[in-house]
Regions:
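Small/polar-rich, solvent-exposed N-terminal microdomains that initiate assembly or binding
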Residues: 1-85
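C-terminal interaction module
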Residues: 7, 174-176
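Extended low-complexity, serine/threonine- and proline-enriched intrinsically disordered segments
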Residues: 14, 18-27, 93, 112-122
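Acidic-leaning, charged glycine-interspersed low-complexity segments
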Residues: 34, 39, 112-169
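Oligomerization/assembly interface segments of phage tail-like spikes and tubes
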Residues: 85-103, 157-172
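Short histidine-centered catalytic/ligand-binding loop motif
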Residues: 102-115
C-alpha cells in the first residue's frame, strides 16, 4: 500500500509527488504486491527509543519499521530545519528503504547494489526540485536519527537497508 497524506502543504507537497513516483516505479519494475510506502514520518519517543511513525488520524500513529512479511518499505524523514531564501525553502529529506531480498523474485544473488542503483537512477530522472546528496547503507547508519531502533534489528543477509538523502526545494505558499 502507498500511504499518502490527504492534506499536503509545504515540504509534504513535494514529498507526496516523489513518494508516488518512486512507489509506482518500484512496484511496477519488480511486480511487488507487498511493498509499503509512507510519506513524511514523525520521530516519536516510545519508552527510551525514537521510532519512525506515520500519522494516521488524531492521536494515532503507525510504526513504519520493518515487517518481515513484506517485500519492503520506504518512508520519508525530514531534517529538523529548512534553509530559507525569501519564499524558497530548502530542506534535507531522507528516504529510507528496506527490502527483503529473499522475497524478490528477480534476486538470484544479493542484488543490493542493483536495487540502490535503480532507485538512484529514478531519483536522477525526477524533478529538478530535488537533488540527491548521499546514499547511506548499513542498519546503524540508515537509522541513525532513530535512537535505539537498530538495536532491535539484525543487519541480516535477507534484508537490505539504505537511505537516500536528497535536498528538496519548495515555496512557502500562503496557507492563511
Amino acid at each position: 500500500l502507498n500511504y499518502r497524506r490527504k492534506h499536503k502543504v509545504g515540504v509534504d507537497v513535494e514529498i507526496d509527488s516523489l513518494q508516488k513516483y518512486l512507489y509506482d516505479n518500484i512496484v511496477c519494475k519488480w511486480n511487488l504486491d507487498d511493498f509499503n510506502g509512507y510519506g513524511r514520518v514523525y520521530k516519536n519517543k516510545r519508552n527510551k527509543l525514537i521510532i519512525p511513525e506515520y500519522y494516521v488520524s488524531e492521536k494515532e500513529y503507525k510504526e513504519v519499521l520493518l515487517d518481515d512479511r513484506l517485500n519492503g518499505i520506504m518512508f520519508f524523514s525530514t531534517s529538523n530545519f529548512a534553509k530559507t531564501y525569501g519564499t524558497l525553502l530548502v530542506q534535507d529529506v531522507d528516504i529510507i528503504f528496506t527490502f527483503n531480498l529473499s522475497s524478490l523474485q528477480f534476486c538470484e544473488e544479493r542484488e543490493d547494489e542493483y536495487i540502490r542503483q535503480y532507485i538512484y537512477s529514478l531519483m536522477n530522472q525526477y524533478s529538478s526540485k530535488q537533488e540527491v546528496k548521499q546514499i547511506t547503507t548499513g542498519l546503524n547508519n540508515v537509522y541513525s536519527d532513530y535512537n535505539g531502533v537498530a538495536d532491535y534489528f539484525f543487519d541480516m543477509q535477507d534484508f537490505h537497508h539504505f537511505k537516500i538523502t536528497t535536498e528538496i526545494r519548495y515555496f512557502n505558499k500562503n496557507c492563511i
